[in-house]
Amino acid sequence: TAATSDIVIVAVPWEGHAELLASLRTELAGKIVVDCVNPLGFDKQGAYALKPEEGSAAQQAAALLPDSRVTAAFHHLSAVLLLDQAVDEVDIDVLVLGEERAATDAVQALANRVPGMRGVFAGRLRNAHQVESLVANLISVNRRYKAHAGLRVTDI
């Protein structure tokens, strides 16, 4: 549970993001919070990015959880691959954003525990909107190519 964990991952639909975080403010105080939420809309043309008033879901989390160490990560992972028992390795880089080095280092280390996965520091929370928004493009790629595409950062 959130109260007993050092690192808490938030992976909920955008529509319930703010309400959930506000209700857990006390339980999440002092914890590293990893926001994985992608503010997306969907219509007949497909997925598209929404722009939260705070700038991103992660920035909204930081505003709602002033006593937590908010990071943003794990946005581009395929739930299908993560749940597939036959998959031994997830070939993906996890972009990790945050304000505090120790918190982003901890989240990178968490990503590195999954075979094939690599945590990569990708900047501060003010850049989380771009990372969250890219999921709309990945959804289009995955639909077109019947894939579970992710990202790799090269030359690091």
Model-derived features with residue positions:
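Rossmann-like NAD(P)-binding element
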Residues: 1-32, 36-45
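Conserved catalytic-site region of short-chain dehydrogenase/reductase
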Residues: 42, 77-81
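Short beta-strand and adjoining strand-loop segment in the mid-core
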Residues: 46-54, 59, 84-102
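Rossmann-fold dehydrogenase core element
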Residues: 53-76
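Active-site-lining helix/loop region of Rossmann-like oxidoreductase modules
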Residues: 92-156
